[in-house]
Amino acid sequence: MNTEFKKIKIAVIGTGTAGCLQTLQFSQELNFEYFELDWIYDPETPIFGIGEATTPHIPQVLRRSKFSTDMLFNELKGSLKYGVRFFNWGKKNKRFEHDFGVGQYGIHMDTSALSTFTLKHIENIEGTNIKVVAEKVKSIESSPNGCIVNGRNYNFVVDCSGYEPLLYKDEYIDSEIPTVDSAVIYRRMKPGKWNHTVHFAHENGWMFGIPLRDRQTWGYTFSSKFTTEEEAREGLQKLMPDEDVSTARYVTWKPRFASFLIDDNGVYARNGNAAGFMEPLQSLSGLHTEQITSIICDYVNDDCSKQLGNEAIIASEREWLEGLAYHYQMGSAFDSPFWNDVAERAKEFLKSKQCSEKDIEDIEKENPKDIERLALGCFACHDLLQLSHGLDTPTKDILGKWKFADFNSYGTDELWGAQDSIEDYLK
């Protein structure tokens, strides 16, 4: 990196989840004797706090930043997340759980509250040199000597500005497996009293349910290839007949990945939605963001080259895609155009992956102990076992021989609650 300034100057742009996580991670990993950090955001640009769920990786970032459980519950309006409950995924089981395991939990949080609290908290972290800059980014340039943002020079910039990045707007790769690309999102103003994320398959896609302390967020996701916004709103109303969902917000996105993480000049990177977005299934977007955050920290600390960083992000993107395909391969309880199309695409995509039925059979014959190291994308063996049983994949019996003989005890009603339908969650 170019270090012509007295201190290495870094800017993070944006205060969404990615901007918060990147700034918090920098606060932990940079030696501020040598770095200065500006966190730039436009106070006139609202953050749409839909309610967000995470994997177990994100709470570790918050813990290292001295966030307490009390802050999580009170400041972020959050709740603990022990896993994901699936309804109507696959052809066999009406309901199954993906449990994170003993001592592992994600969180549900209000994304706008995370932004507000982190902005207030960040400048008070001891031993840092972080300045919050409240202004709209009107100009940005990248060159071999650094970035210029609104006339100020920086050695490195992380763009967390959202779906529309500030530079390289066309440098993306379209998804190989188009799944859902739109959602109608409804806030139900009653506390969510459960500790898992809900993934409820419907004929046009699937719906997520996220519990916060003061409300619930329900998102009816669908593919614009098969379903219109009006049809999606009708579908949401059908699933929630006693709610007035007319206030539900419509959002859409193009499933895609960034073609690189760090630009050719080595001075600009993207994170969060600016680095690409597939869909919200299993909170994998948050995991992808956390991985990018770590790679960028390694890069600015000279622990990772530009080439390795870019290779790592491509690998992370492939893992995300593989994880999605594994969920969709068995279809759902619905014989509909969307599910038939996406299941066929997912099966075809997975034929070349390590978790294919033939590959697992080969591992079992040649070296059974390798089953323990089997993984697909971001899912380890114990995750695959739960998903394979719940989805009833062809590999479930082989996987089941090697781990979690007491699998059926996972996700007991005593821990998870006995909700058996959307109606049970809305009581």
Protein language model annotation of sequence segments:
Residues 298-427:
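Long, low-complexity C-terminal extensions of enzymes
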Residues 202-255, 276-287, 299-302:
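Conserved FAD/dinucleotide-binding core of flavoprotein oxidoreductases
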Residues 27-50:
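Glycine-rich FAD pyrophosphate-binding loop
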Residues 8-35:
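N-terminal Rossmann-like FAD-binding beta1-loop-alpha1 element of flavoenzymes
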Residues 5, 90-148:
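Conserved N-terminal helical subregion
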Residues 46-101:
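N-terminal FAD cofactor-binding segment of flavoenzymes
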Residues 121-236:
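Predominantly flavin-linked oxidoreductase catalytic cores and closely associated redox partners
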Residues 258-321:
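Conserved mid-domain beta->alpha element of the FAD-binding
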